Amino acid sequence: MHSASVWVSSLTMAAASGWFAATMLAQPATSKEPRFPQLTMDQLNEAQKPLGEQIMKVSSVGLGGPYNPMIRSPVLGQRLYDLFYYLRWQTSVPTKLNEFAILIIGRQWRSQVEWYAHAPLAAKAGLSPDIIAELKASKRPSNMAEDEAVVYDFVTELTTTQKVSDETYAQAKKVFNDQQIVDLTAVAGNYVMVAMMLAMAEETVPPDKEPPFKVGEK
């Protein structure tokens, strides 16, 4: 996961500052009150500050996205942060495939923030723009490499049928070891939880950005 550490430090400062600048802008008069007003570091209490400092070191969205509701429960938030950290930067699954799995969940949930945050990361990690575009269009991507096809089939089958068939598992064993299969399962489940957190909190992309999924889009 050395490649992740190369881009994360530069991405954090630029993206986090941009997210904060956008999310702290005044909302249109017709918009409803946010369920969780965006917090900044100087608003955090003593229980929240240590977690906030950790988040700001690695997050591409600052304290936005799932971190905004999550930090309201700092003990739980710390446990989740530790899980996020492993599944993003220490997982045994290669970065490109890990981000692909996250996008699959983001598309299933039509999670605006999840897709907005992770589509650029997937592309940066080497996932083909065509694969990203076809997935966004709710299609099974064509021209996938063997390991990409395994990720798509494994994650999609597990999350839509609540099981993994012997055939799909056998295909996974051809390209992944036991630890990678466990980590792939965990990242899929984790980002379902992230999508749920984002949906509950009604977190949105920055107001000056276009949501990835249009209203009514299946």
Where do the PLM segments sit?
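Bacterial N-terminal signal peptides that target proteins for export
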Residues: 1-15
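Hydrophobic alpha-helical membrane-insertion segments, chiefly the h-region
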Residues: 16-21
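Hydrophobic alpha-helical segments
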Residues: 22-218
